[in-house]
Amino acid sequence: MKPQFSITSNGSDITSQIADRLLSLTVRDEAGTKSDTCSVVLSDKGQNLQLPNDGTELEVKLGYETLVSLGKYKTDEVRFAFPPATITIRAKAMPDTFKTQKTRSWDDKIIADIVSEIAAEHNLNHRIASEFATIEIEHMDQTEESDAHFLTRLAKEHGAISKPAGGTLLFIPTGEGKTASGKALSVIEINVDEATAYSCTQKQRGKYEKIIAKYNDKETGTEKTVEHMLNSTSEDSAVKRIKTIFPTEAEALEAAKAEGIELQAGQIDVNVTIVGRPDIFAESPVKLIGFRSDPMDTNWTIRSVTHQFNSGGYTTKIACDNSD
């Protein structure tokens, strides 16, 4: 089957206008808080192409007989180059307004209300996983801090990720392969025969064995700590201390647990390149079949997916973390 693509610009299909000029189309889907991105490289022969305005919405689809949407992106950069004469259009899923610094306080709010309010400010829909929706935030300051950074900080404290994707602000579990509704993502199976290239890198296990977080005890008016152990019970364990002082013991412990999950993640990295598959998305669980059993016979979560379409065909490159 021959791979195909389509691109719409502010809702208008421009595929036929650029098909004979397309040199490459790249979509990078990121797990976690990084913004998903899109890059379109076109031949600028004749220099008569109409260029997109800053903030133009592009929707990209890839596939074969049936095309799959890989998201919507706002253009934020156009680059000209010679030789050869080319135009590179870059776009991202995160709105520029997300970078604007703000100062405000969030008091006696549940996370669902915070996410909903920020999403509305940026004309986004929102989806939040049920396990986070009703968590109460007694007090949290946003001081000269962008909404992107603030939500990242809030999400990290609760073992979640928060990012705009496809016009929706997400607040979902980190690396658990679930949608915002709590539904498990389908396990992606990749056979070694599908791979055109792959690599596996083992990294030294993190040095920290204990996480300490601080909080204000209202009853005594003093600063106290909570501890979360990772792999050791030794008194000589290396300690990671979280700088933030939390308003409650529960929030401090939640943040310590989330920090522990992050420190233990990604101790083995796997990268696999296969023939293009538009059904593969970041955060999905992966099962590798027929690869070297040690250390690749384990559970994986996709950290990033790069879809690339050009004259040579359509490939999908995935980068995975071990999720055990």
Question: Where on the chain are the PLM-derived regions?
Answer:
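Assembly/oligomerization scaffold segments
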Residues: 1-96, 195
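An acidic/polar, Gly/Ser/Thr-rich interaction patch typically located in mid-to-C-terminal regions
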Residues: 21, 25-50, 194-324
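Amphipathic, non-transmembrane alpha-helical segments in extracytoplasmic/periplasmic proteins
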Residues: 39-40, 103-127, 142-165, 283
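Sec-dependent N-terminal signal peptides of Gram-negative outer-membrane/periplasmic proteins
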Residues: 46, 78, 84, 99-102, ...
